[in-house]
Amino acid sequence: MTSSAADADYQALVFDYARSGDQDATAPVRHRVIIVGAGPVGLATAIDLAQQGITTLLLDDDDRLSTGSRAICFAKRTLEIFDRLGCGHRMVDKGVTWNLGKVFFHDEPVYSFNLLPEGGHGHPAFINLQQYYVEGYLLERAKQLSNLEIRWKNKIAALTQTDAGIALGVETPEGSYTLHCDWLVAADGARSAVRGLLGLTSEGQTFRDRFLIADVRMDADFPTERWFWFDPPFHPNQSVLLHQQPDGVWRIDFQLGWDADPVAERQPDRVIPRVQALLGRETRFDLEWVSVYTFACLRMDKFLHGRVLFAGDSAHGVSPFGARGANSGVQDADNLAWKLGLVLKGLAPQTLLDTYDSERVYAADENILNSTRSTDFITPKNEASRAFRDATLQLAKDCSFARRLVNSGRLSIPSTYADSPLNTQDTDDFAGAMVPGAPATDAPVRIGEQDTWFLRQTGNAFTGIYFADGEELSVERWKALRSLSESPTPVSLLLVVANGLRSKNTDSANILEDVEGLVAKRYDAKPGTFYLLRPDQHVCARWRSFDADAVHSALKRATGHLGGSRAQH
């Protein structure tokens, strides 16, 4: 790319096809891992593997990034993953931050909600950011990694696999060539070519409704909130969603009904009056992008097929209500990359990848359930359902119990893998949400004189968190803690102390001051408490007192060396 990060028009960039030396090799070149698809999921997976030192090849059949109406809502958990990949700050700096949402029935506000009601978190509940910016920032991060190669205009046209590996037929503007690989990650979207070549399908429910997306550039004084209308006077008997993107662009979704003509509804003479009815005829705006879509909630039966792993839209799909598509895809990458990295390094058995399948199938089912419920509430299919919905909305203004029933899209939250075989079950009493399998939560900390965030000190490796009391650690305790870094799968050690304290004789260990006491509070920790986090920042074990043998056993379990390979749900 020739444009700078500050002024790149990511929708206009074209990436030149370049002939690879693999195309001139006398025999097919073998790669350890090949990823198909340079969208957010493929790029995130490739960056994660490359950061682990795994030489990675990424193939894409196009020569440009996404354009127009794609994902725009990126959740707090996804931003934390982007932090770990080295580009989260760029997303937040560019994106429109929001925590608040409002729901209207007709033209009356029913209630508002705050998706991040407590302070002390490094990121907001959501940012709105066009997908082409997300892809652009990920791509620029990828280009910083010398062991990550991207080949544009390389299309997968054939695929065969055996127990020993995979052979790919690749089409380019200069003809076809063959590649071999140990593992293939299919992140090539809802119309996955890899899935088709294997004769696999996604099954589920297609919803009989149509929606119009209008991305509108305008100067407006709307607050940076998510506004959702049921049956508004400017668009009767349907729903409308409005929220802001960067660059003065606003996303407006209009429900149209199944009988709407998708071609006619995209025409400006249809779109402009709808937008004017919402904004007022005096508001000046330009149409940036218009599309009409239908959607389905579906998934593959399983996400691991031999040596092929499916992630993102190639594996599962949901309705747009709740921003669960791109966010769940990035969380697929987060779950997959550390496991595949350990397998490729010989530090874990191949059966560890079975837990990618079981954990992320479980997450997909959660997302599909929530997405389906949202869709059923937003688009009632009969008079009884509509009567229930409208009565709920009428009550919600004054009755808190009814607000819990209003569903304008249950917004994306990460899954807790409570039944994962990688967890070591509690033997001590704990309170709170940080159970084994839960995504770790954030809190403010201080390192030396620098204020920072707890989660930014974790990830990319197993992390041990010891809550100290500021007193001198015994030689035996310190030696046992330090031994974790010498295990076959090393553990990065963090010591958490109360504000203003310093643990003594801890050499170069990272000492985190719990400046507001929120780390201890959110993890229900006391002096001596120890947590073990996975490389994807999910809790896998915790104890009230440190026991080196127990931690080493938990580490073996979390890397697939103990117990079964599949979670039961």
What are these regions (language model features)?
Residues 2-36, 51-52, 105-108, 136, ...:
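Helical substrate-recognition/capping region of FAD-dependent monooxygenase/halogenase enzymes
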Residues 10-12, 246-248, 262-328, 348, ...:
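FAD/FMN-dependent oxidoreductases across multiple families
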Residues 29-31, 174-183:
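Core beta-strand elements of the Rossmann-like FAD/NAD(P) dinucleotide-binding domain
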Residues 38-39, 131:
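Glycine-rich Rossmann-fold phosphate-binding loop(s) that bind the pyrophosphate
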Residues 50-70:
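Glycine-rich FAD pyrophosphate-binding loop
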Residues 67-143:
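Active-site-adjacent segment of FAD-dependent monooxygenases/related oxidoreductases
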Residues 109, 140, 145, 183, ...:
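Conserved FAD-binding catalytic core of PHBH/FMO-like flavoproteins
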Residues 152-166:
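A conserved short coil-to-beta-strand element within the FAD-binding core of flavoproteins
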